[in-house]
Each structure stands twice: as structure tokens, then as C-alpha cells.
């Protein structure tokens, strides 16, 4: 297990090279966070299709869509697209952590947790909230850009307007994520694919049939923390968020409790002695302050 925990190609770096690689990889991470605003902005357009169809002429056909499909476009499509975008990023951020010279796999997951949480707060909360409010009043926003006081007021007034999007997001995560954890459809399909194509020796076949999956702490904690930030941020502005948050967290609690008892195996190579929880508490305290 100690052998598997080490990232041996990162053990040969001297301290100066490791610091240089760390700075370079964090620079790439921040560039990713900044330029990821483009697809996030496109996602936010779907949540304001009524306003966009009024202001942009060639989108007028959207008004002719029946109410049920239009409700799906405004409510389900943006949150689903955001969840898909979020699922594409962790492998790329994990690669950043690995290339920065982190020597062990558990520390790579800790670094991934930090990077992914920063991304979700900056992109999925701050930028998405601002975009959702700005798109409803573009003229006033551009007029107030040169006046810092009015600009700050525009940003603060944009926060309540994005509440409906985050309500849909919490409902989607609470229902779909918990259902996916209980059903385990994707892991089941992958199990049979691995048995068919990767079980070339009796040893590999035994491991495929008897080894359990381990929880992906580096992505699980940021996703849960992001929902917590939404609940804290809108608990006064939009009190109905409290109900959605309670239902979502209760469903996720049942799903993960079942998984930890019967599905997951916390492997020693990813053991951090509780550092994920400590970092999560620090992040929540910082956001609260």
C-alpha cells in the first residue's frame, strides 16, 4: 500500500523545481477558472431565455415553444449542463496537482479538493450569479460600469435573481445524485466491461470481482461544500432554499450512508487522517467570514 501511495516520478524533484512547478500549475488552474466563464455564461443564458428572446430578434421563436418544454429548457437544461461541465473538470485539475510535483496520491486528492472548490465558488456561484442578474438588465449594467458605487449595487441586486437557478440545481443534485448512488448503474456497466476486457489473468479477475471502489474525496467534498454555500447564501434572501437544502442533504445522507456501509472501501492509499474534513471546515469558516 505504501508503494502504491507514492507517485514515484514526482519523488526526484528538488525543492526549487517542485515550487516552480507548483506555481506554474496553479497559474494554469487559475487560467482554467477564468476561461471556463465562457461555457458557464452560455449555461446562464438558458436560465434567462425570456429576457434574451425579447432583446435578441432571432430568438423570438422561443416564445412559441409550449409551456412544458419551455419550463424544461429554463429549469432542467441549465442545471444539467452545469453538472456536466463540472464533471469534465476534475480529471484536468487532478492532472495539475500531479504535475505540480505532489509526492503521494492522497495529497493529490487534497490538492484537487482545493482547486475544485475554488473553481466552483468563483465560477458556479460568483460569476454565474452575476451573469444571471446582468443579463436581465444589460443596459443599466453598462451604464453603471464607470461608477463603482452603482456597479456594486447592480452586483448585489443580481444575487436574489439567481435563486431560482440554484433551487433547480439543488433539486437536481439531491434527486439525481442520490438516485445514481443507490442504483450504481454506471459502476455496474463498468464492472462487466472490465470483466470482459481487463480480466486477462486469474489475479486481475479476482481483484476486479472482489475489490470495492473508493470514494472520490477530492470531488465529493467540493460538491457538498458548494451546496452548503448556496444554502447559507440564500437562506435569508430566499428562505425556501432551506427546504430544498434539507431534502437534498437528507437524500444524499441516505445514499452515502448506504454506500459507505455496503459499496465503498476506504483504501489506505487515499487515507489522510481526516485532513479533508479539516480543510472543509476551514473553507466554510472562510466563506462565512
Describe the residue ranges of each PLM region.
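Transmembrane transport/permeation module of multi-pass membrane proteins
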Residues: 1-287
Amino acid at each position: 500500500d505504501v508503494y502504491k501511495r507514492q507517485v514515484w516520478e514526482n519523488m526526484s524533484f528538488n525543492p526549487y523545481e517542485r515550487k516552480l512547478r507548483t506555481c506554474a500549475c496553479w497559474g494554469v488552474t487559475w487560467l482554467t477558472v477564468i476561461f471556463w466563464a465562457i461555457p458557464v455564461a452560455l449555461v446562464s443564458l438558458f436560465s434567462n431565455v425570456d429576457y434574451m428572446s425579447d432583446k435578441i430578434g432571432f430568438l423570438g421563436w422561443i416564445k412559441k415553444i409550449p409551456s412544458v418544454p419551455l419550463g424544461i429548457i429554463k429549469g432542467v437544461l441549465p442545471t444539467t449542463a452545469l453538472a456536466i461541465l463540472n464533471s469534465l473538470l476534475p480529471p484536468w485539475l487532478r492532472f495539475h496537482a500531479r504535475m505540480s510535483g505532489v509526492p503521494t496520491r492522497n495529497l493529490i486528492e487534497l490538492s484537487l479538493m482545493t482547486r475544485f472548490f475554488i473553481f466552483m465558488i468563483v465560477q458556479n456561484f460568483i460569476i454565474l450569479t452575476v451573469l444571471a442578474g446582468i443579463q436581465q438588465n444589460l443596459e443599466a449594467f453598462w451604464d453603471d460600469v464607470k461608477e463603482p458605487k452603482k456597479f456594486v449595487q447592480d452586483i448585489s441586486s443580481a444575487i436574489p435573481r439567481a435563486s431560482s437557478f440554484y433551487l433547480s440545481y439543488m433539486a437536481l443534485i439531491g434527486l439525481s445524485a442520490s438516485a445514481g448512488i443507490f442504483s450504481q448503474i454506471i459502476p455496474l456497466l463498468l464492472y462487466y466491461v472490465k470483466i470482459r476486457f481487463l480480466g486477462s489473468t486469474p489475479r486481475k479477475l479476482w481483484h476486479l470481482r472482489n475489490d470495492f471502489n473508493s470514494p472520490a474525496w477530492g470531488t465529493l467534498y467540493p460538491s457538498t461544500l458548494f451546496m452548503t454555500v448556496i444554502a447559507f447564501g440564500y437562506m435569508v434572501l430566499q428562505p425556501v432554499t432551506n427546504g430544498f437544502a434539507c431534502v437534498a442533504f437528507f437524500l444524499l445522507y441516505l445514499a452515502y450512508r448506504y454506500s459507505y456501509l455496503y459499496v465503498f472501501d476506504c483504501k489506505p492509499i487515499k487515507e489522510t487522517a481526516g485532513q479533508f474534513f479539516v480543510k472543509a471546515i476551514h473553507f466554510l469558516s472562510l466563506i462565512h467570514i
